Amino acid sequence: MQGFKVAVAGATGNVGREMLSILAERRFPVSEVVALASSRSIGREVSFGDRILKCKALESYDFSTTDICLMSAGGAVSKEWSPKIGAQGCVVIDNSSTWRMDPDVPLVVPEVNADAAKGYGKKNIIANPNCSTAQLVVALKPLHDRAHIKRVVVSTYQSVSGAGKAAMDELFSQTRAVFTTDPVEAKKFPKRIAFNVIPQIDVFMEDGSTKEEWKMMVETKKILDPKIKLTATCVRVPVFISHSEAVNIEFEQPITADEARDILSSAPGCLVIDRREPGGYITPHEAAGEDATYISRIREDPTVENGLALWCVSDNLRKGAALNAVQIAEVLNNRGWLKPKRKVA
């Protein structure tokens, strides 16, 4: 079978490197993989399976013979380049927030709304959701199908890798500074992150919510159901990888914890670890490097009719970003919605 020519834009970043790794791990059918970055990173080396790729400049790359661009170069770059890339007949799967709420751009989590990807043709762009939204809707979808969700209250515990490599470096350097009694410098975050939690992710909006909280609300509606009410409190925690969420759900129909556990145990993308004993649950440390959305602490909420509570954890660099993008590419291939371009001899 002829493979796809795939470009990874932002290949030197956390998510870009993970995209390359996952393309190789999952043996996505490629004829060629091209690593792209800014002009200042030309020649930098990144890994693709057992091969080493040298980065080329996004600004001068010709996409006319490329089938898919996995875009993880940031919102400003995506806003400028994704339409140009799409106009050359290359499908962009974008990890930034730039295109998520565009009515002509599908916002896709394959376990939830894979059919939406078929509508990519208007702009040749498909949007990846916010990392915290992706794992949430994977957990909510099978429960929504069973008992119809009315309202969700979610508190997130988001790792620093969601803010990039510089944020991971800051947590490391601050932690070291605390133990060596050196001054603690906060540059990437508004306050110290080491041994602390910060109840702000992204900028504040007029109603007092942060943009991250707003993203979770509007993206869940677009992906899952516009009638679902959702409120979120998003918190940055001193963890390197994996986001955790405490989720409270109110349903229209009755559903027990046992029913929910059975449903989630067989749901695509979910892995239930829920033993009512010390350590019988998942933590972000254990989820790092894994593909699943892990569900624990499933229980009924006696304070609201038809209520459940649960704990949800996933690797934000994988399911929350890179893995989801590659899964979208797999949907396009497996369903025949995208064919490799014919190469001119």
Feature locations, PLM:
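Terminal hydrophobic/aromatic helix or amphipathic segment near a protein terminus
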Residues: P254-A288
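Internal helical hairpin/lid segments
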Residues: A232-T233, P238-P268
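N-terminal Rossmann-like NAD(P) cofactor-binding subdomain of oxidoreductases
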Residues: M1-I193, K229, A257, D262, ...
